[in-house]
Amino acid sequence: SSHLLTTSYEAKLITNKLSFGMYSFHYFTDAFCDELVKDLKGFDGWTKDRHGNYPTNDVLLEEYNPNLHQIYSTCINNIVLPLINTVYEGSTFKKENFNHETFIVRYKPGIQNSLRLHHDSSTFSIILNLSQDGVDFEGGGTYFPQHEVLVKPPKGHLVIHPGKMTHWHGVRPITSG
């Protein structure tokens, strides 16, 4: 097998089910997240209207850092995709036909502190906190009203959820940070 999680048993051991169709696991170290955030603070190429219906203050990972995008894509193909195929029983996604648009969103008071409720256009979506709630920012979190769940993953933790129909969500306001 060409991926790092060689059995479905391994995938299930590292994954926590948060709610219907929502799974979380630790993905990046705090040190990696801290270095990336430090680097992003000096970045000035943030967009405000790249998504027509639900614009976010973001940057495509591929435009921000092509080398990091390549590494991240390898991680998606070798860790996340096999995990999706395990926790979403019946999924048979292959890396050859699995595309992703990875972007980093910045929520900040005075720039964009929230995002209204919406469905993503993706089959699956990933939420990954690079900062720690209560330390680096206050407020926020991704709210799923149909599931009555507020997701605030710890720094470095990833949350996967279906994108299109079943997981309507929005980001609650960041109050500081």
Language-model regions: role of each:
Residues 81-177:
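Catalytic core of non-heme Fe(II) oxygenases with the double-stranded beta-helix
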